[in-house]
Amino acid sequence: MKSILETIGSCPIVELSHSLVPSGKKLYLKLEQFNPNHSIKDRTALGLVLAALKSGHLAPGGTVIESTSGNLGKSLAMIGAAMGLKVIVVVDPKVSSTAVNWYKAYGAQVDMVNTPDGQGGYQRARIERVQQLLHEHPGAYWPNQYDNPQNPAYHDEVTAKEFARLDYDVLVGCVSTGGHLSGIARGIKRDRPQVKVLACDVLGSAALGGAFSPYLLNGVGLAWRSANTHLDCFDYHSLIDDHHAISMCRILARESGLLLGGSAGLVAYGALQCLYGSSAKSVLAIMPDSGTNYLDTLYDDRWLEQKNIHLYGVEALRQDLQANEFKRSRSGRDLESVPSLSY
């Protein structure tokens, strides 16, 4: 290999052996933490930058400005360092100090937004700041992971190919910008239309419909629905709260040796919902990132206590999984009009 960028992708799939997986069924985990910055956003960032360079929207040696909750900023910063680009990442107080230092290690400039929008979220405030910075840096490029069609297009054309090597009934992922799950789903369904797709989101997010309310998880959810969230790509949906997602993270770390981020815990729980509440025999779940980003939050008991997070044990999770009916979204129907699985 001639560049760190060539190490992006080809992440492993492991079968989860845990008592929470129903007997006779299989849960496979696609571990995107094996990308160089430990998240699926390495793929997204690479796809957006390559497309921009090809189209001329980004000049060699130019400037990239993007809003990020954590992972995409790391990916863009690394790519900028490798390709000689200036990178400015716009973040908010939910970002960890580790992530900020990560950006700076690659030479990126960090711009912090401290005031939330009227709904209590930071995404819109970050985007407004991006617009200001674009005026201050003429010729700069905004990848706009939320609405840029090159986001799902890259995952459709490239990432989805890695999901064709295994037989499974349902693909499970999470939504924020919607780009990776929409693109992967589209690529898979083109060749294997029988595969169903479950879109998971955090309770409080408005990405799949409904009103926004603040939540703790990073890297999942949005205060609105982005253009890259294509509802027609999804067959099922599930809304999962912070407590269940974080509990899943802690259990998988302690009992399976899997140190996962909050969005991955959310997806793992959603995948189990599918196995418990549907006829699916095998599920492939996309684990977006590593827990290394969250050692001082999700994996810190004092932080959880301060945030009033209740951790469920294995048996409590099993009872919830057995008690809840799994609902299917009708094809072509807006998910916000379909009752969701909420906890």
Identify the residue ranges that each predicted region occupies:
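PLP-dependent amino-acid enzyme catalytic core
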Residues: 1-343
